[in-house]
A protein has these predicted regions:
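Nucleotide/phosphate-binding site architecture used for ATP/NTP-dependent chemistry
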Residues: 1-49, 56-59, 63, 77-196
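Canonical protein kinase catalytic loop motif
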Residues: 63, 68-70
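Hydrophobic residue at the +6 position relative to the catalytic HRD Asp in the kinase catalytic loop
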Residues: 72-74
Length: 196
């Protein structure tokens, strides 16, 4: 981010205080016939910026950058939609044994479960901030928000391996491991079944 002009870039951590998430929602709600759908569109875009994009790298290569609240920057287009995400710190996390381990800008974690625990820990504050903002400005329910998070992860685990021509079984396993890591933090990212 140090090399980027700051026009239309904003740090996710500052987005609530500056009213940017509410502004995104109001713009979408004004253009759509249903405010609930507008809320889901905005929430999905923000969720994708935090967890969806990093999941693409995780499911295809078993690596991750830091999607932490203070590290993630958002770029909006002329219509107020998200078109890019950026990082203040581009350090990549890998698992010991990865060919990148020991390279500059790379931190090796001791095992794959440690990578999921770290990533869930880094995603939670940003996702929680977005969830609270969307509940406040759009009335999006907590349950629906966390379901959208789970759908983003499952979507990445499903589609990225096909598009990147990587192992789909490995991608699905990594996606489920990430969902489990978020669940272990108490986040309800799996859909619940209704029994009648």
């Amino acid at each position: 981010m140090a090399e980027q002009g700051k026009r239309r870039w904003w740090r996710l951590a500052d987005g609530i205080r500056e009213g940017r998430i509410e502004l995104m929602y109001r713009r979408h709600a004004a253009e759509m016939s249903n405010a609930d759908i507008a809320a889901e569109v905005v929430a999905t875009a923000l969720i994708h910026a935090v967890v969806g994009r990093v999941m693409a790298l995780l499911v295809s290569e078993g690596r991750a950058w830091d999607p932490g609240l203070e590290n993630l920057w958002i770029h909006t287009d002329n219509d107020g939609g998200i078109d890019w995400a950026g990082l203040a710190d581009t350090t990549i996390r890998v698992v010991d044994g990865d060919v990148l381990a020991g390279e500059p800008g790379v931190v090796a974690l001791p095992c794959e479960p440690a990578l999921y625990v770290w990533l869930a820990h880094r995603c939670e504050p940003a996702l929680s901030l977005i969830q609270h903002a969307m509940a406040h400005c759009a009335g999006l329910s907590e349950r629906r928000f966390w379901t959208l998070v789970g759908e983003s992860i499952v979507g990445a685990a499903t589609y990225v391996p096909a598009l990147a021509r990587t192992n789909s079984i490995e991608g699905a396993r990594r996606g489920q491991a990430m969902i489990a890591a978020l669940e272990e933090r108490g986040l309800p990212v799996r859909r619940t079944c209704f029994v009648r």
